[in-house]
């Protein structure tokens, strides 16, 4: 059996512009502290795999310290961690996914197409992709079908399900089932 935790849309370093300045600063501090509470949760519940589906940062160029804090928190986890950058924190020049040193247990998807990672000990195959720009009009799952090979296949993507406008990795419900 595999135990996994999924998360997304942390939006670290958000300005919280609708809040008064002091409250916004408190929320940013709380968001950063949450990372280490998450690490404690993962370790305390024997989680094997952490799947983070994008927009961990509110922009593609957050404060360096925030990227380093996230890397430190993920490094404390005794789980394997996979990250699929989203439309706010897309993978590209200057992004923390390139500028921060990430721990050995963290894999960041870097391509705007599905990449495959295998974990033979768990009979698991993970498919993930990264936004490499703020918009991704073509769906990452278009034309994909998981092979019937007896392995557990998990997809890790940041996107929208059945959107009216295709801007952020449009995903059709039928594609999820494939």
Question: What do these predicted ranges mean?
Answer:
Residues 1-68:
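N-terminal active-site segment of His-dependent metallophosphoesterases
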Residues 49, 60-178:
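His/Asp/Glu-rich metal-coordinating catalytic cores
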């Amino acid at each position: 059996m595999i135990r996994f935790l999924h998360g997304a849309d942390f939006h670290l370093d958000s300005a919280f512009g609708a809040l008064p300045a002091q409250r916004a600063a408190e929320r940013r501090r709380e968001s950063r502290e949450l990372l280490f509470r998450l690490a404690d949760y993962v370790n305390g519940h024997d989680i094997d795999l952490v799947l983070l589906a994008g927009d961990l940062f509110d922009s593609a160029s957050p404060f360096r310290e925030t990227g380093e804090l996230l890397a430190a928190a993920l490094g404390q986890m005794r789980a394997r961690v996979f990250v699929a950058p989203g439309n706010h924190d897309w993978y590209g020049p200057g992004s923390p996914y390139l500028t921060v040193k990430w721990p050995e247990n963290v894999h960041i998807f870097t391509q705007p197409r599905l990449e495959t990672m295998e974990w033979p000990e768990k009979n698991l195959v993970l498919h993930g992709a990264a936004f490499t720009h703020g918009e991704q009009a073509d769906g990452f799952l278009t034309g994909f079908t998981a092979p019937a090979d007896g392995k557990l296949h998990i997809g890790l993507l940041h996107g929208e399900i059945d959107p009216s406008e295709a801007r952020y990795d449009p995903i059709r419900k039928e594609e999820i089932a494939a």
